[in-house]
């Protein structure tokens, strides 16, 4: 058997070089054609080499040779070189489909920002697909090493570039602050805030229904300010609590923000409340500060006034001179005698 195989290889070696020789000759023809000066579609000397139809056939044959097809077993290149292994191709297509879905979700959720609450399942899916590619490095030496061929086979490293873009966007939006620890669902605080946010917007819309048929925008939003005051205060209070909780959990990073969905929702509500509706809510902290300031201002007055009223008032005693005493006593004696 070994001898037969050796004979087959020795007898078939010229056929392996036939495509190379043919391709070399075709390239020489093309170089000769390119070197010819021409000013029109039919230039002198062109018919001596190849006609236009033959030139097209040469181009098609050259392309077929370069792609490894069209000649069957006589192909220059291995048939599997331009394409990936089936397993690697499947992993790449899974990542491509997941990336396309996540990209579409991110763009649709750009304004108003609903990135974290809408796209977190798709982000988890992309992370899983990327992890599958990274882990698939081939169990044996003969197995497909998809991680290397898909991630680091070229200078561009497009798969890694796309994955890093998603990760950096997710970190910039701080979506982890809106999700649970495993990132599979929204946190309780986020759900409560979004519920209050929707109720506040519904209150705004309900109290504006009477002005929808007016051609000019209304200038008086007293109904909105009066009826939605409690909802707005509850939303602001919950947002402040979430900020304090986030500050306690991230003492090492004092500038850590809440997730972009919560921040954008609160910014929208504040703009509607203060700029559009021109509503104002008296802050309880301001009242307390003013009261304490007035008390401290009048404290010295109260202190001096109370000390003056409750201090012991000593009566002044006049000391008469001796001469005055003797004269007064003598006058008294004369009065008694008369």
Curated annotation (Swiss-Prot):
Q: Does the keyword Transmembrane helix apply?
A: yes
Q: How is it modified after translation?
A: Undergoes proteolytic cleavage in the luminal domain, the cleaved fragments might be linked by disulfide bonds with the remnant of the protein.
| UniProt signal peptide | 1-34
Record bears the keyword 4Fe-4S: no
Q: Which domain of life is it from?
A: Eukaryota
Phosphoserine modification sites are: 326, 329
Report the transmembrane regions from the record.
289-309
Q: How does it sit in the membrane?
A: Single-pass type I membrane protein
Question: Which keywords does UniProt give here?
Answer: Glycoprotein, Lysosome, Membrane, Phosphoprotein, Signal, Transmembrane, Transmembrane helix
Tissue distribution? Expressed primarily in osteoclasts and melanocytes as well as brain, kidney and spleen. Found at lower levels in the thymus, testis, heart and liver.
Cite a single GO BP annotation: transepithelial chloride transport
Q: Where in the cell is it found?
A: Lysosome membrane
Which InterPro entries does the annotation name?
Osteopetrosis-assoc_TM_1
The residue spans the entry assigns to the Cytoplasmic side of the membrane are as follows: 310-338
**Residues in the Lumenal compartment per record:** 35-288
Q: Which disease is it linked to?
A: Defects in Ostm1 are the cause of the spontaneous gray-lethal (gl) mutant, which is responsible for a coat color defect and for the development of the most severe autosomal recessive form of osteopetrosis. Osteopetrosis is a rare genetic disease characterized by abnormally dense bone, due to defective resorption of immature bone. The disorder occurs in two forms: a severe autosomal recessive form occurring in utero, infancy, or childhood, and a benign autosomal dominant form occurring in adolescence or adulthood.
Family stated for the protein in its record: Belongs to the OSTM1 family.
| Subunit text | Chloride channel 7 are heteromers of alpha (CLCN7) and beta (OSTM1) subunits.
For this entry, the protein name equals: Osteopetrosis-associated transmembrane protein 1
Give the species this sequence originates from.
Answer: Mus musculus
């Amino acid at each position: 058997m070994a001898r037969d195989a050796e004979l087959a290889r020795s007898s078939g070696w010229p056929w392996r070089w036939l495509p190379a020789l043919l391709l070399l000759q075709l390239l020489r023809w093309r170089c000769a054609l390119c070197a010819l000066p021409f000013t029109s579609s039919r230039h002198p000397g062109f018919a001596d080499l190849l006609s236009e139809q033959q030139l097209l056939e040469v181009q098609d044959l050259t392309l077929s040779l370069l792609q490894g097809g069209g000649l069957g077993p006589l192909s220059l290149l291995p048939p599997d070189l331009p394409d990936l292994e089936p397993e690697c191709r499947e992993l790449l297509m899974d990542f491509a489909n997941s990336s396309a879905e996540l990209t579409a979700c991110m763009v649709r959720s750009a304004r108003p920002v609903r990135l974290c609450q809408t796209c977190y399942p798709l982000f988890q899916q992309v992370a899983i697909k990327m992890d599958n590619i990274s882990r698939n490095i081939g169990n044996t030496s003969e197995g497909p090493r998809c991680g290397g061929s898909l991630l680091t086979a070229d200078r561009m490293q497009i798969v890694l570039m796309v994955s890093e873009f998603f990760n950096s966007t997710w970190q910039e939006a701080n979506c982890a602050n809106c999700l649970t620890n495993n990132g599979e669902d929204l946190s309780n605080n986020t759900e409560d805030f979004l519920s209050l946010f929707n109720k506040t917007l519904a209150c705004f819309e309900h109290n504006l229904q009477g002005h929808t048929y007016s051609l000019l925008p209304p200038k008086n939003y007293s109904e909105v300010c009066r009826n939605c005051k409690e909802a707005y205060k509850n939303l602001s209070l919950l947002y402040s609590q979430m900020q304090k909780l986030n500050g306690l959990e991230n003492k090492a990073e004092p500038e850590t923000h809440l997730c972009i969905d919560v921040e954008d929702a609160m910014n929208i509500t504040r703009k509607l409340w203060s700029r559009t509706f021109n509503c104002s809510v008296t802050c309880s902290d301001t009242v307390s500060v003013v009261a304490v300031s007035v008390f401290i201002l009048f404290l010295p007055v109260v202190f001096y006034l109370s000390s003056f009223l409750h201090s012991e008032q000593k009566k002044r005693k006049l000391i008469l001179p001796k001469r005055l005493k003797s004269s007064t006593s003598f006058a008294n004696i004369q009065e008694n005698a008369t």
